Amino acid sequence: MSRRGTTEKQIEKPDPIYRNRLVNLLVNRILRNGKKSLAYRILYGAMRNIRRATKKNPLSVLRQAVRRVTPNVTVKARRVGGSTYQVPIEIESSQGKALAIRWLLVASKKRPGRNMAFKLSYELIDAARDNGNAVRKREETHRMAEANRAFAHFR
């Protein structure tokens, strides 16, 4: 067993324009091949589209979208006596937020549209209104956890 202590969780830095940690989390998930300026351009373009389409503060739309997509429980495969069970597990808010961001990005990549900023903005707007593929994914996960509640004692 390791004698090394556990490291403290690093606090995410806020982004330069909105000064928000959630925006920076989203940028870091969009990031590919170290092109952070491109990731910022995509997200800020999406924020402009949100402001144009909804006439609301894009940061509040983003927060509401992430809140609506964040799951409370998830299922984890657990092997017991030769068979695999999907065991429902409650997850903490940081893990739920990470899942929500991942689902939002996957759903927006699957959308038809001109570019990623456009697709992301409309996925965020839909999620804030409680519909869209990311919200469907959360509901599906909750249904799966509810269906497998009988296996919760395997935790």
Curated annotation (Swiss-Prot):
Keyword annotations from UniProtKB, A to Z: Chloroplast, Plastid, Ribonucleoprotein, Ribosomal protein, RNA-binding, rRNA-binding
Quaternary structure (record): Part of the 30S ribosomal subunit.
GO biological process, any: translation
Gene behind this protein: rps7-A
GO cellular component: chloroplast; small ribosomal subunit
Gene Ontology molecular-function annotations: rRNA binding; structural constituent of ribosome
Membrane-traversing stretches: none
Function: One of the primary rRNA binding proteins, it binds directly to 16S rRNA where it nucleates assembly of the head domain of the 30S subunit.
InterPro entries from the UniProt entry: Ribosomal_uS7 (IPR000235), Ribosomal_uS7_bac/org-type (IPR005717), Ribosomal_uS7_CS (IPR020606), Ribosomal_uS7_dom (IPR023798), Ribosomal_uS7_dom_sf (IPR036823)
The UniProt record lists the keyword RNA-binding: yes
Domain of life: Eukaryota
Pfam families in the cross-refs: Ribosomal_S7 (PF00177)
Protein family membership: Belongs to the universal ribosomal protein uS7 family.
Localization in the cell: Plastid, Chloroplast
Listed name of the protein: Small ribosomal subunit protein uS7cz/uS7cy
Major localisation: plastid
